[in-house]
Amino acid sequence: ANVLIAMDDVDLGSSILEPLKPLRTHLVLADGVLTLRELDARTGQGQLGGTVQLDGRDAQALWTADLHWSGVQLESWVHQKRADNAPPYATGRLNGQARVAGQGKSTAAILGSLRGGVRMQLVNGTISHLAVEAAGLDIAQGLGVLIKGDDALPIQCNVVDLVADQGVLRPRVLVLDTRDSTLWVDGSLSLATEAMDLRVVVTPKDFSPLALRTPVHVRGSFADPSVSLEKSKLGARLGAAAALAFLNPLAALIPLVDVGSSDDAKRGGDDCRALSARIAANPVLQAPRPATK
């Protein structure tokens, strides 16, 4: 089979996500291998492209995907309804790429065996001030934001680099830097069991008398996660030795962040370079060491 496909609207199965409008691809079926080539889709004012392949020649099908996306407006792609005309929790143009593979007789089995990597960056982004203060457990500033009303903090540096192995996603680097705080995430997301075990650490750049600076754990199923504090770290400042775990991976990703001739791309690279230098120079701002069990 050799078919050119053009679809005006592809529903992603969720009322929260914007459909793909339109989607065009070249379907080729030969010798038990189904390939979608030259995939070209639009969503959230951005573009998704790449190749997807399903190889059914073995007892268990092998699924591979090499995808890239750019200019996807997060606030358009993910519907974020908030009361009292508050700004969206997060905005910006999402760029990234995914190269993954999985094997099995069902979608669940393929996801449960997924391996590869995903990289993303949010350009010209903002994040809810209230969300940042809540993640950092800054009670004083959080109350102030509640009283005055939420506002959008510009994101200075945002890098996501996920590694997939046997259906488990782990952040090699997941950092979000604003003028207010730097947020780091480590842990794991299991596509096989649909469970998560994440740790979120926020290092504030300002002084607040009620900032606990306590790592937050998000654990449980995707459908019903629970949030708890890391008791052993309650009230403790992050130590100088904690930074180096994420510093080198962040520095290695900066050339990828800095790709492109646009002012936005250059600014993103400069901001992430500044964050990397600040981590190396100032222990108070350093990244947390990945949790060990």
Predicted regions and their residues:
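Gly/Ala-rich hydrophobic membrane-inserting helices
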Residues: 248-249
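Small-residue helix/turn framework positions
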Residues: 1-239, 243, 255-271
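Membrane-engaging insertion elements
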Residues: 257-291
